[in-house]
Curated annotation (Swiss-Prot):
UniProt protein name: Large ribosomal subunit protein bL17
UniProtKB keywords: Ribonucleoprotein, Ribosomal protein
A single GO molecular function term of this UniProt record: structural constituent of ribosome
Record-level GO cellular component terms: cytosolic large ribosomal subunit
Family the UniProt entry places it in: Belongs to the bacterial ribosomal protein bL17 family.
Originating gene: rplQ
Taxonomic classification: Bacteria, Pseudomonadati, Pseudomonadota, Alphaproteobacteria, Hyphomicrobiales
Gene3D superfamilies: Ribosomal protein L17
Known partners and oligomeric status: Part of the 50S ribosomal subunit. Contacts protein L32.
Superkingdom of source: Bacteria
Disulfide bonds: none
């Protein structure tokens, strides 16, 4: 019996699940919106909500706790500088999950998870900078 066993296994080992959630949390903080399957979105929501609360605390111990959880310095910097100040007056409920139909290949239910008051320009900003840099080097060569 699996009474009182909270959380989804998502057909992964514990270490794979932990790494996947760390990567998804870093991506969500960086881009402020990601598309994933509905069960993964429901599992990542409380993790990122706790990270935003750590960012609102803002002290060194909270920063180190966030780094130990998502292991991405740039994402933690954005979390503590931009996102935490944006949600300073909000007590929880930083994310929304919207259903986004079904995936073509396996009919898995998809969802968009995003910050409630997100920065629209943040999505894909890193990719735009990378593409611009590649185009610049191509012109120079």
């Amino acid at each position: 019996m699996r009474h009182q066993k909270a959380g989804r296994k998502l057909n992964r080992t514990a270490s794979h699940r932990k790494a996947m959630f760390a990567n998804m949390a870093a991506s969500l903080i960086t881009h402020e919106q990601i598309v994933t399957t509905l069960p993964k979105a429901k599992e990542i929501r409380p993790i990122v909500e706790r990270l935003v609360t750590l960012g609102k605390r803002g002290d060194l111990h909270a920063r180190r706790q966030a780094i130990s959880q998502i292991r991405d310095q740039d994402a933690v910097r954005k979390l503590f500088d931009a996102i935490a100040t944006r949600y300073a007056s909000r007590n929880g409920g930083y994310l929304r999950i919207m259903k986004a139909g079904f995936r073509q290949g396996d009919n898995a239910p998809l969802a968009v998870i995003e910050f409630v008051e997100r920065d629209v320009d943040a999505k894909g900003a890193a990719d735009k900078a990378r593409v611009a840099a590649e185009a610049e080097t191509a012109e120079a060569a």
